[in-house]
């Protein structure tokens, strides 16, 4: 299998971000490479399977594909019209079913297409290659037969998923066999390895160690997930080193493998950034938001599907901002636009009163200059207004304050009982998420009748309580606590009377309700400094002594960035969300505004993979730390879950049997 030579790793060459490399490989290395000889000026058919069509859609637009000479996109398993004068590009998984369909298309006297350029998404077996070579009628019609080694969804400029939506159930559930769990991990390992094959990176592989791995202790399959995944990835990388031309032979980056047990609170706590709140509160389908546009003629309002994604500059600027900050910036943008328009100024003077954001929105829409740019601005003003209404209607400020106080040890059981007894307007989901956080910090409070009493007080169903009880399957903060100094686990603050599972980071409290931070933030910073304890996070390979030399760049960057962030306060900022003080220049989102910073001076990449689903707050952390550490931090996971999705998945879990070391196969 051939593989083109492109220097995209962080150890040399022009630096491009993760999604950019993915996109360029698909468009140029695959689609454009099929433009050979006499076929240069002709249109082609692109044939994909259910997985590869998603890979393509996450990385490229249809216009990009068309520009590379593709006039038609087809599903390999659907009946297709013969186009014998056209060439076909196959981007498919290397499965027996796909190969059979390909041979059916191209064999015999009347093939569907003139020539076939075949690109497999991951390594293909010798058996399947042999199966293709056996058909003598097909061989002359093959223009290329290659491994792209690209089998992941690039969901963000610094994020990918392996499309294992049921990983939590398959790996943490009781009903699933260890064989099914192993199969899931094997595919996962192969797909993660294609990330490194694509970027031409060879990582130092570190992973969360099993909590008790000795001859006298029983351990569970779920506790060995990072260990087994690390071994699987390592095996795949060893093959890539031998088969891929110019693949690095020494470490060029770092990979840290974790699972959802590392932080059970991040998936359910209310996150207050614009991006997270949109996906949490607006019932969006993926990144699609249904925008209702009032009719200018007084008729029925128009419904329009819009995508909230990186191509939208306003979304890109605001997605990691606190909702109060985002609302304020949108108001400022609208005001600035109107200040440049004389007709709008006259209208404002006639009314005499201060204009609300909604008034500004209506005025802008009535202006003759109303354009696509203002349409985008109006869209985000509407979204922010809707979010702020929901925050008020659902009493999320009070709930959010209690959640964060619980996490930081400033509140306890009495405060939760008081809240459940007095806040009758609180939503069912809000109370459920509160109890899930409580169960992580105080698991003993849900034993026996105690759990039943809390369920009655919160007026939750037994189905809801299944999610609460299943938090224990991910390991509670209490169970995870280790006595070793510098350990990775959730630690208690001895200075507080109540139990705390996060240490205060004063620089993080730029806005109220933004104290919480995901555990991976602390882990990534320790990894970058070389301070992760080896007993908790062993390494599959011992990197060369010079490997950590690149981290000196990150420490220099840290010292040069220690400037206080500018306060965004004004008379319009709600009192509940006002900034609480200065920070280190990274906190609120001053760094995130410049997330598309110059990558050319970046150090070695850091990859973090979380089995069991990642959160938007964790993705935000990776953007933030990339600028702080001067190293591109890429988050991978089995899926990207918003709180409702995570709760649904958690309800599917049941207790798992213990696994003896004799049964362990790594």
Swiss-Prot record:
What Gene3D superfamilies does the database record attribute to this sequence?
Answer: 1.25.40.60, 3.40.50.1910, 3.40.50.2060, Syntaxin Binding Protein 1, Chain A, domain 2
> How does this protein lie in the membrane?
Peripheral membrane protein
Q: Which residues form the signal peptide?
A: none
Biased composition, Low complexity: where in the chain? 550-568
Could you say which tissues express the protein in this record?
Expressed throughout the plant, both in mitotically active and quiescent cells. Enriched in dividing tissues.
Principal localisation: cytoplasm
Among SUPFAM superfamilies, the record links this protein to:
Sec1/munc18-like (SM) proteins
Provide this UniProt record's keywords sorted from A to Z.
Cell cycle, Cell division, Coiled coil, Cytoplasm, Cytoskeleton, Membrane, Protein transport, Transport
Can you say where in the cell this protein is located? Answer: Cytoplasm; Membrane; Cytoplasm, Cytoskeleton, Phragmoplast
Q: Which residues form a coiled coil?
A: 340-377
Please cite one Gene Ontology biological process associated with this protein.
Answer: protein transport
> Entry's InterPro entries?
Sec-1-like_dom1 (IPR043154), Sec-1-like_dom3a (IPR043127), Sec1-like (IPR001619), Sec1-like_dom2 (IPR027482), Sec1-like_sf (IPR036045)
Q: Where is this region: Disordered?
A: 534-589
Q: Does the keyword Transmembrane helix apply?
A: no
User: Which is one Gene Ontology cellular component term of this protein?
Assistant: phragmoplast
Its domain of life reads: Eukaryota
- Biological role stated in the UniProt entry: Regulator of vesicle trafficking involved in cytokinesis and root hair development, but not required for cell elongation.
Quaternary data? Binds the syntaxin KNOLLE. Interacts with SEC6.
Query: In which family does this protein belong, per the annotation?
Result: Belongs to the STXBP/unc-18/SEC1 family.
Name of this protein = SNARE-interacting protein KEULE
Origin organism of this chain? Answer: Arabidopsis thaliana (Mouse-ear cress)
